[in-house]
Amino acid sequence: MEVKIMTNQSTIDKLIEMRLTAMADAFRIQMDDPTMKEVPFEDRFGMLVDIEYSNRKNNRLKRLIRQAEFEQPDASIAAIDYQSGRKLNKALISRLATCEYITEYRNIFITGATGSGKTYMACAFGMEACKHYYTVRYVRCLLYTSPSPRDRQKSRM
């Protein structure tokens, strides 16, 4: 019995060393659960792999969202308000939410009046791209459209 405990602990240590921490935690839980002894090895192993895989995907998504530096990280396509006065094309927004424009090497430019929800829309599209595991960087275009000092000097002449 003690040899088995040592072997299991050694296995857990190796999983942690290989950075399979979610799998190591799940393995500990499986070992402590008497009902798991009745589950076939292949099923138990599959559960461990699924847990590690899900954990890695979740961590990757969190990292992508954090690195995107969204102004509104809670933005969501599902929460967009399509009131008639806003003149939003729901079909177009749904199509853009699939992120096909990214595979086609296209960009999205969102224009509108102040307070119309441009930032929210941009963040919502960015969040959707993150959910498809694309790297996103949120940048305000104002930085790129303001005249340079050289342009201002030319306009004075």
Give each language-model segment a name.
Residues 134-143:
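Short beta-strand-centered segment that lines the nucleotide-binding/catalytic pocket of NTP-utilizing
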Residues 144-151:
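Conserved small/polar residues in nucleotide/adenosyl-binding loops
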Residues 78-96:
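N-terminal pre-Walker A segment at the start of P-loop NTPase domains
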Residues 119-131:
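Walker A/P-loop
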Residues 107-119:
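Walker A/P-loop nucleotide-binding motif
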Residues 98-105:
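Phosphate-binding P-loop
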Residues 25-71:
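Interdomain "pre-motor" coupling segment immediately N-terminal to P-loop NTPase/helicase cores
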